[in-house]
Amino acid sequence: MSAEKQTHGFQAEVSRLLHLMIHSLYSNREIFLRELISNASDACDKLRFEALDNPALLEQGGEPQITLRVDKDAGTLTIADNGIGMSENEVVDNLGTIARSGTEKFLANLSGDQKKDAQLIGQFGVGFYSAFIVAETVTVETRKAGEAVNNGVRWESDGKGEFTVETVPRDEQGTAVILHLRDDAKDFLDDFKIRQVIGQYSDHVAFPIVLETPQEGDKDTKTETLNSATALWQRPRSEVTDEEYQSFYKHISHDFQDALTWSHNKVEGKLEYTSLLYVPAQAPFDLYQREANRGLKLYVQRVFIMDDAEQFLPQYLRFIKGVIDAPDLPLNVSRELLQDYGPVQKIRSALTKRVLQMLKKLSNDDKQYAKFWAQFGSVIKEGVAEDRDNQQSIAALLRFATSKTPDSVSTSLDQYLESKPADQDCIYYLLADTPSAARQSPHLEVFRKKGIEVLLLSDPVDEWMVGYLESYKEVKLVNAARGELDLGDESEQANNDDPLIQRLAASLTEQVEAVRATTRLVDSPACLVLAEDQLGPQMRRMLEAAGQPVPENKPVLEVNLDHTLLQALTRIEEDEKFNDFAALLLDQAMLAEGQLPKDPAATARRMQALLSQSV
């Protein structure tokens, strides 16, 4: 007899996801079978792993396989496995909640646009819940491997807010997902349809997928293995089609979109391993959440060891999906052992170089690389600081907007070097809070006049990044808005002995480090310059957001003595009026940098007074 049935409510995020998913993914609904077979495959993988320490688990359940059962009379499709199974607590946790941080933020990003939402939901990973796209009711029967027959569990729900759980006897270990199909999904009871979907999405699954169909007028059941059941990464590259590579990517990533590119490589010699690495087309929603799971699927001698083996790639390549099969590693390897195990460090170094080579090759296709950079550019920039051994290779992958192509983040450092004048001995860049502030910065005026290209950096991590990238191919990187600028003869014409410089310095002594004449400017009256040892605004904000103490900065004010406004200031004798104009000059220089004046109310009062005098 079964124990008393208990009713539970879905976590709020699950109810929302189910509702959105059923409507957004209906046109791509066959993916439910891919998702459920992937889950069954994972369960078989985990059983084989547990059986390394407890071989009896395999002996009790037989060789792992996935079974599909069709019952046209009942209108049900069953996806069953004899894998690891679940306990009652695991059933409630796994089938009633979404244990991923950032879920609420992810759901808030869904727009109601069916096509866009389908991509986002696919990128999030729907897994088991995809069953409700085609089923009006879902029943799950499971027993954890090694548990007694009486400890089976039955879970059931119509996906409308609640589910029931009860303890039932179950002879078989593993899990069976029974889908009571909607009337408009009965085509998934057709043998031909099932073969087609398995062939498209799941042929590469490493365990047999067996279709069982009852025969009319015969008590026997027909069985048919639908997939090749071989580890795709162990096959020669020449025998694997692009469609198979893409299908396998979707299997391991649960992504709906094709990967941008991939690299399949087998290394033989003292250290043997096979890797299959993919670059996704879209960044996961939790890319910047430290606690998010990431890493490669690790196999040893084709035996699954763990998901999310993060020790094989550095943090800045955390978006890479794939498989690593290392037969020389011990089968009982742990995450702790992986961290300091010599062979793992060698594999990590080789895989890192392989990914960078893969991205370098992708960069030859401007259109595809633009897609990649829009999704993962900020993460690649982390590598400039984190991976000094590969810093120059990473720097070659960077892309920038420039003063000559301000609306396109597409210029590489190599392209910059190729187009610069022969006598230019450095790479100039400008930091700004926004792309608009960078494009309109007064600091660019003299560079435009002299035909010198400047990289425009407005990503919040850019200042931190260039702090580590001192040079590229032995050409120094120079901040166009820091320190004194030397572009040739004109820098010698700045007259810092002009009385106006002394008077402005006295008036603004509390607000600025110094006032000096400039050759940076052509059309603007003034600009702010950082001293050589001062933090820029991007770095200040990063430190403040992290709760770090930040020293107070006083900028240097550089003024254009040839500008009519500065020439007008020389004619003001009254100190109070001069001080107001000097303060406004500083305020407008701050605004031109995309910064707010220190005292906006005082700025407004001075502007009102100035406007009143002018009317």
Swiss-Prot record:
Residues 336-541 are annotated as: B. It is found in: Cytoplasm. CDD domains: HATPase_Hsp90-like. Keywords: ATP-binding, Chaperone, Cytoplasm, Nucleotide-binding, Stress response. Residues 542-615 are annotated as: C. InterPro entries: HATPase_C_sf (IPR036890), Heat_shock_protein_90_CS (IPR019805), HSP90_C (IPR037196), Hsp90_fam (IPR001404), Hsp90_N (IPR020575), Ribosomal_Su5_D2-typ_SF (IPR020568). The keyword DNA-binding does not apply. It holds the Pfam family HATPase_c_3. Its main location: cytoplasm. Gene3D superfamilies: 3.30.230.80, 3.40.50.11260, Heat shock protein 90, C-terminal domain, Histidine kinase-like ATPase, C-terminal domain. GO terms for cellular component: cytoplasm. Residues 1-335 are annotated as: A. One of its GO terms (molecular function) is ATP binding. The keyword Nucleotide-binding applies. PROSITE patterns: HSP90 (PS00298). Belongs to the heat shock protein 90 family. Homodimer. Molecular chaperone. Has ATPase activity. This is Chaperone protein HtpG. It comes from Alcanivorax borkumensis (strain ATCC 700651 / DSM 11573 / NCIMB 13689 / SK2). The lineage of its organism: Bacteria, Pseudomonadati, Pseudomonadota, Gammaproteobacteria, Oceanospirillales.
